[in-house]
Amino acid sequence: MTRLILATRNAGKITELRAILADAGLPHDLVGADAYPHIPDVKETGVTFAENALLKAHALAEATGLPAVADDSGLCVDVLNGAPGIFSARWAGRHGDDQANLDLLLAQIADIADEHRGAHFACAAALALPDGTERVVEGQLKGTLRHAPAGTGGFGYDPILQPEGETRTCAELTAEEKNAISHRGKAFRALVPVVRELLG
C-alpha cells in the first residue's frame, strides 16, 4: 500500500481530509505532515490557491521521497473583490487566529445588506510526486455570509458561511453533511481518480 502524505499539520484539516478520501475509497496509507516533524513549513508565496497547493505538495514530496497531497483554500467575499482569498488564514495578521479573522471580516462587512453578502469557499487540491509530476483540481462552495457566527463544528470561517440551499452555517452541519458539499470535499473527491491514475 502506497503511503500518501497530507501536507498539513492542521489537525482539523487532517481529520476532514482522511474522512473525505476514505469515503471516496482511496486505498492508501494517509499520514499528515506531523509524522515528519523535521520538515519545515513551506512559505505560501503563490498568488493563487493552486500555486500555494503545488508549493506545499512539491516541498513535501521532495523532502520525503513520497507522493504528497496538499491544498490551499480560503474564503472569497464578493463585495471585497474575492478577499480575503489566499490571505484567509492570516486576514487579521496572525496566521491561524480563527476568531480574530472572523471578527475582522464581520466588522468589514457589518453594513453590507444581505443581498450583497455573497461569498464562496475555494479549494485547490494538488498531488505532487517525487519525480516532479503534478496535478491540481479545484472545488467551490457558494453561500452567503451571516451577520454573526453560528455553530461549533468545523474551523476557520465555517461559522459564518451559510451554503446555498441551506438554513444552517457550515459550522452547524455534521462533518458528513459538510464533507458532502464542501469546497474541500469537492476538490479532494476530484483528486481521487488522479491519485488512482498516477499511483495505481
UniProtKB/Swiss-Prot annotation:
UniProt: substrate binding residues: 8-13, 73, 155-158, 178, 183-184
An example Gene Ontology biological process: nucleotide metabolic process
Catalyses which reaction(s): XTP + H2O = XMP + diphosphate + H(+); dITP + H2O = dIMP + diphosphate + H(+); ITP + H2O = IMP + diphosphate + H(+)
Cofactors demanded by this protein: Mg(2+)
Cellular component terms per the entry's GO annotation: cytoplasm; cytosol
Keywords from the named record: Hydrolase, Magnesium, Metal-binding, Nucleotide metabolism, Nucleotide-binding
Matching InterPro entries: dITP/XTP_pyrophosphatase, ITPase-like_fam, RdgB/HAM1
Stored Gene3D superfamilies: 3.90.950.10
UniProt remark on cofactor binding: Binds 1 Mg(2+) ion per subunit.
EC annotation from Swiss-Prot or TrEMBL: 3.6.1.66
One family name in Pfam for this protein: Ham1p_like
Active site: 72
Keyword Hydrolase: yes
Quaternary assembly: Homodimer.
Free-text function comment from the UniProt entry: Pyrophosphatase that catalyzes the hydrolysis of nucleoside triphosphates to their monophosphate derivatives, with a high preference for the non-canonical purine nucleotides XTP (xanthosine triphosphate), dITP (deoxyinosine triphosphate) and ITP. Seems to function as a house-cleaning enzyme that removes non-canonical purine nucleotides from the nucleotide pool, thus preventing their incorporation into DNA/RNA and avoiding chromosomal lesions.
Family as reported in the entry's similarity comment: Belongs to the HAM1 NTPase family.
Name of the protein this chain belongs to: dITP/XTP pyrophosphatase
Organism: Streptomyces coelicolor (strain ATCC BAA-471 / A3(2) / M145)
